[in-house]
Amino acid sequence: MYEYAIYPFDYMRITQSHNDGNHVPHWKNVTNYSDKPWDEASKDSGRQYFIPQNDYVVEQVLIDSRSVRLRTKNNVLIPYKNEPVTLYITLTHMKLETMKRLYVGQLIKKNEKIILEGDEGGAYGNHFHCTANIGTYYGLKYNNNKKWVFCYEKSLLPNEAFYIDPDFTHIMNPKGYDFKEVPIGYRKGDSGTDIEKICNFLSNFVKGNYYGDYCEACVSVYKKQHGIVGDGTTIDSQTLEAMKKDGLKL
């Protein structure tokens, strides 16, 4: 069963979106290289950690720009597409003390606190300058709008790259981004037993074999049977309530 890409900060306080201020020239009216960054300042003006909810591997450490490129160790499910992909993210503005702890090939495990936000590399106040991406990496490029960008095959908005686990991330300011919650059974407090119970329950309503994630496929069929609209693979509150009425016990 594939894992979901979870937003890697315990507090969401996005202070600048991709379409605000000096982030706009990163992508608008660009004829060559682009990315779509956002700034995550976390809980307060102090220094907070990047707290991964998936395992990541360090791809590149760029001391001069105070940046690091990471990729998920495993393929993950992201809101942008319904198939597992390798997700690439970049973080910028860390202090030198943090940069010296990082090296290529380093495994950063789930919940491991290594990367601490900072205010270096042209930053105003402590925060992470972030990008999320999929596909081929073409390099740190200087675009026709005179901005340095992390150029990948496809740059994603934060809500296209990550799901939210409401038991982990406290949302203070999503800056207009509409995030999806990770399905029930995959959250921080959920156990594998819940997944097994849900799959066994759904097998009473759905017959036959399905490709991909069996539980997700069954959820989609169940929701259609019950006239529930929305993301076909997500066990939202309405779906969970319907399941409980049909006899699901967690």
Predicted regions and their residues:
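Extracellular LysM carbohydrate-binding repeats and other cell-envelope/extracellular binding modules
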Residues: 221-250
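Histidine-centered divalent-metal-coordination microenvironment in nucleic-acid enzymes
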Residues: 125-131
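Acidic, Ser/Thr/Pro/Gly-enriched interdomain connector segments
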Residues: 169-209
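Surface-exposed, glycine-biased beta-strand/turn segments
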Residues: 1-79, 109-110, 119, 123, ...
